[in-house]
């Protein structure tokens, strides 16, 4: 790939950028709207500091996938419009024509038009490997009784902790955070390392990534056997504008044709991939996500955020 350019998601640049890029105008199959997708540059909407998904140093898995797509779709380069993934993220990026695709978006969210899903994962339980909790696969396991479990407040697994009688001793971590100044996932894994908590429940991609970054050895167990209750497994798509029908079809073809390569990227970042039967998807070498080494650029990522932000953002966990 050629050099990657960066675009900040500032309001002042919206009109200038919208007027400056060479757009492809394509009639919609229904209605008179046109598509404004840059034919030369893959323009990606991203969070500036939210590993393992993305950061401004372009070390995230979304950015690795973007580079793959740009290469396969013959784009000259990749550019990023950065904005914290919170209320206003879609409006300030994709909706303002600053970028043409959100690489990771939960299936079914009506703020964007979804492509076909390109991976499926779940919330996961993390605990020390070969420790007292070895073999635990569900929140209801008696081994977790009287244990202190870290949980992101307001996420679906909290229902299962309450059902198992574990919520009273649980340590809550914030869901609504500014990803540029706080990191609930890293804090939780750090607390697991110090013994402040005995286990952690996190969104799968975060669980896998931060467990890999940690000095200690951890087991990451996708929560797929919890019984009736809120969904814990979700399909993840790419998000595009409602008017961009041909662009969606282009991305769907790319997902179909390069699914294997996309899987390898996700697994390398620690994402516990699941098929539709909740069975783990392995790498081409037969390894699990936790057995694969992190990409070198991901190992070097600074996951501590600079204290210079004011907006409130949320971890990109699916809403269930």
Predicted feature residues:
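Alpha-to-beta junction loops
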Residues: 75-77, 94-104, 147-148, 188, ...
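Ligand-binding clefts/hinges and TM-proximal coupling segments of bilobed small-molecule sensing domains
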Residues: 26-29, 34, 156-177, 252-320
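Extracytoplasmic small-molecule ligand-binding "clamshell" domains
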Residues: 27-105, 109-110, 179-182, 269
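Acidic, polar ligand-binding/catalytic clefts
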Residues: 67, 71, 79-143, 154, ...
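Bilobed "Venus flytrap"/periplasmic-binding protein-like clamshell domains
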Residues: 48-52, 56-72, 125-184, 205-206
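Periplasmic-binding protein-like
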Residues: 47-48, 120-132, 212-255, 272-296
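Bacterial N-terminal signal peptides
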Residues: 10-20
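Extended ligand-binding regions for polar small-molecule ligands
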Residues: 26-27, 35, 60-73, 130-133, ...
């Amino acid at each position: 790939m050629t050099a990657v350019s960066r675009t900040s998601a500032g309001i002042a640049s919206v009109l200038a950028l919208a007027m400056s890029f060479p757009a492809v105008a394509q009639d919609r199959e229904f209605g008179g709207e046109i598509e404004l997708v840059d034919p030369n540059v893959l323009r990606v909407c991203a969070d500036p500091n939210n590993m393992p998904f993305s950061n401004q140093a372009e070390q995230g898995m979304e950015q690795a996938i973007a580079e793959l797509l740009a290469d396969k779709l013959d784009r000259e380069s990749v550019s990023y419009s950065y904005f914290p993934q919170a209320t206003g993220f879609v409006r300030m990026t994709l909706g303002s024509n600053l970028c043409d695709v959100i690489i990771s978006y939960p299936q079914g969210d009506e703020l964007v038009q979804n492509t076909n899903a390109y991976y499926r994962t779940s919330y996961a339980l993390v605990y020390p490997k070969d420790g007292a909790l070895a073999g635990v696969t569900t929140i209801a396991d008696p081994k977790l009784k009287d244990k202190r479990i870290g949980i992101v407040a307001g996420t679906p697994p909290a229902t299962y902790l309450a059902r198992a009688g574990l919520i009273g001793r649980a340590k809550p971590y914030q869901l609504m955070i500014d990803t540029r100044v706080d990191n609930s996932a890293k804090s939780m894994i750090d607390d697991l390392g110090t013994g402040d908590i005995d286990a952690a429940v996190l969104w799968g991609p975060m669980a896998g990534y931060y467990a890999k970054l940690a000095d200690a050895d951890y087991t990451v167990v996708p929560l797929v056997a919890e019984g009736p209750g809120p969904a814990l497994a979700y399909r993840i798509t790419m998000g595009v504008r409602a008017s961009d029908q041909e662009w969606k079809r282009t991305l769907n073809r790319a997902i179909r044709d390069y699914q294997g390569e996309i899987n390898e990227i996700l697994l390398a970042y620690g994402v516990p991939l699941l098929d539709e039967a909740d069975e783990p998807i392995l790498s081409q070498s037969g390894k699990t996500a936790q057995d694969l080494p992190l990409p070198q650029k991901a190992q070097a990522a600074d996951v501590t955020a600079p204290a210079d932000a004011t907006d409130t953002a949320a971890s990109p966990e699916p809403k269930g």
